[in-house]
Regions:
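C-terminal scaffold of the Radical SAM
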Residues: 18-45, 55-308
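Local cysteine-cluster metal-coordination motifs and their immediate loop/turn environment
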Residues: 8-21
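Minor-groove-contacting beta-hairpin "wing" of winged helix-turn-helix DNA-binding domains
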Residues: 332-336
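Short amphipathic alpha-helical interaction segments
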Residues: 310-322
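Short, amphipathic alpha-helical interaction segments positioned at domain boundaries
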Residues: 337-350
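A short, conserved structural fragment
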Residues: 321-331
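Extreme N-terminal starter segment of soluble prokaryotic enzymes
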Residues: 1-3
Length: 350
């Protein structure tokens, strides 16, 4: 089982970001964490969660480092008995707000993986993306993370912007390699609804061409691709999603999954604080669960179990195998090109 914790607080809102987040609301942090503690108690009881069964925790956002580390202590005290002894605990952080003190305190609480929202090592691109840090701060943040005791560090990159060229992307790869990070998450710029970037096609470049180039160069730099957007030392939390593991979800905007249903927390900070037990449930039937497993397996090294496929789906998978699009090994079909994951999944699903 996994645990996702959503920290919606941000210092500023990036123009491409469609995630649930708020600015200027840090004064609500104490009440928010209290609500999450109450929510966790209810979820573990209602969903029959046993102690030491949570194998991974992920603090995402928003910006977890926008909130003082002291606010996390009561929550860690609450969740600790349910964590496996080798639990992977990741916290996202921004280079400008992840101070050495914050990193040390979070490391002492048990966080053992840090994920920096670097996005780029070019200051003009960072400005274009609305980021409030610069390349120098990225390098300092990684150095501080090492000093704080972290030996598992991720850096996020965004590509497919109007400023990107193969030459510049090659330099991005050189920077993450030289920093010695363990993992890279690389995301194509998407023009999401309800964001300032929405519909502005002039902000993008051909991400398919750039994606192929970036994937090749990241792998040449030693970051092996294991999922459509992730490279390097495998993140257990990411892998857990692709394996269709159950996951609890704390915080406003967060989504959880248990057995055959998905639940949605209140999509509003104040509403969540007022009633953290407000949940919208979505029951998934066997066909929907089957489709999800096909899509998730096609997007990652997890692969697709042959035994979950219907006879027509198995026939389609064999066709793709004969065309060299899939490999079959030990009862699973493995995708040879993650960029075609959705098309492959749709073909198999029929």
């Amino acid at each position: 089982m996994l645990l996702y914790v959503h920290i919606p607080f941000c210092e500023s809102k990036c123009p491409y970001c469609a995630f649930g987040s708020v600015t200027g609301a840090q004064n609500l942090a104490r009440d928010y964490f209290s609500a999450m503690i109450n929510d966790f108690r209810a979820q573990t009881q209602n969903l029959d969660v046993l102690r030491r069964r949570i194998s991974s925790v992920f603090f995402g956002g928003g910006t977890p480092s926008a909130i003082g580390a002291k606010f996390y202590e009561p929550l860690f005290s609450e969740i600790s008995p349910f964590l496996a002894r080798d639990c992977e605990i990741t916290a996202e952080a921004n280079p400008n707000s992840a101070t050495l003190s914050w990193l040390k305190t979070m490391r002492n609480f048990g966080v053992n993986r840090i994920s920096f929202g670097a996005q780029s090592f070019f200051d003009d691109k960072l400005k274009f993306l609305g980021r409030i840090h610069d390349a120098r701060q990225i390098k300092k943040a990684v150095s501080n993370a090492r000093a704080a005791g972290f030996s598992n560090i991720n850096a996020d990159l965004i590509y497919g912007t109007k400023l990107d060229t193969k030459k510049r992307l090659l330099e991005e790869v050189s920077n993450v390699r030289d920093l010695g990070v363990d993992h890279v998450s690389a995301y194509s710029l998407t023009l999401e609804k309800n964001t300032p970037f929405y519909g502005r096609q002039s902000l993008k470049k051909d991400s398919a061409v750039l994606a192929k180039f970036l994937i090749r160069e990241l792998e040449n730099a030693g970051f092996k691709q294991y999922e459509i957007s992730n490279f390097g030392r495998i993140c257990r939390h990411n892998l857990g999603y692709w394996q269709s593991k159950d996951y609890l979800a704390l915080g406003a905007y967060a989504v959880g999954f248990r057995r055959n249903f998905r639940f949605y927390n209140a999509p509003n900070l104040e509403r969540y604080i007022a009633n953290p037990h407000e949940k919208k449930r979505e029951i998934l039937n066997s066909d929907e669960l089957n489709l999800e497993k096909i899509f998730l397996g096609a997007r990652s090294v997890v692969g697709i179990e042959a035994k979950i496929l219907t006879p027509p789906q198995l026939k389609n998978a064999r066709i793709l195998e004969s065309l060299g699009k899939l490999k079959f090994k030990e009862g699973r079909f493995f995708n040879e090109n993650f960029l075609l994951a959705d098309e492959i999944a749709l073909f198999i699903a029929g």
